[in-house]
Design a protein with these regions (language model features):
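Beta-strand repeat architectures
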Residues: 1-45, 53-124, 129-145, 153-203
Length: 203
């Protein structure tokens, strides 16, 4: 199903379930105080620049998005404030299909959820705090750079399935991987910043 937005819409809530693919495209935008909720095994692709201020919640399946900005700035996943409850990881895969960017958005990791950076030439720098009890997995062909030693606030494991995970400073490397300090490497590459100017790489 392809939804073409040619104007601004302000629903109370957006809920997408099922096993198919729903793609939201066009020059319009999702605005207002709406929340976007994704369940079911299918895919929801958000390809519009949205300004809704409610939370984005993924329970199951794939939520595909092509832009990511700081909190309160419009993006494919809205313009919610920089609070953990505004971006919920409760299962499934967040699939980022855009280019290099950075964000200070915080998130709540409730259960194992994957963040996939699709493009090999894309780097996403995370400057927010992720908290919660769930596991967080990284995958794809691109790179996630951790820009703050407060990012790993969640209690679950960090799982690297693909792509690159870059701990960009010595302080971040020393802070550990999640409050459980449990790292599971299934694939991909881990880069850590040492006391010298270089990086240690593990794969």
């Amino acid at each position: 199903v392809k939804v073409n937005l040619n104007e601004t819409v302000s629903p109370a809530v957006v809920v997408v379930k099922g096993n198919g693919r729903v793609s939201v495209d066009g020059a319009g935008t999702i605005s207002g105080e709406a929340s976007v909720n994704k369940g079911g095994e299918g895919t929801l692709a958000l390809n519009t620049l949205n300004s809704y201020t409610g939370p984005t919640v993924l329970h199951e399946g794939i939520l595909e998005f092509n832009s990511l900005t700081n909190g309160s700035e419009p993006s494919a996943i809205g313009a919610s404030a920089n609070f953990a409850q505004s971006w919920i990881f409760d299962g499934g895969t967040y699939l980022y299909t855009g280019g290099t960017t950075s964000t200070d958005r915080a998130a709540q990791v409730k259960s194992e959820t994957e963040l996939n950076i699709a493009k090999g030439d894309a780097t996403v720098t995370m400057n927010g705090v992720f908290e919660g009890d769930g596991d967080l997995a990284f995958s794809g062909d691109g790179q996630v750079t951790i820009g703050t030693n407060k990012f790993f606030g969640y209690k679950g494991a960090t799982i690297l399935r693909g792509g690159k995970l870059n701990l960009s400073t010595t302080d971040i490397s020393k802070a550990g991987i999640g409050s459980s300090s449990k790292l599971v490497m299934v694939g991909g590459e881990l880069k850590t910043k040492g006391e010298s100017n270089g990086y240690e790489t593990y794969s």
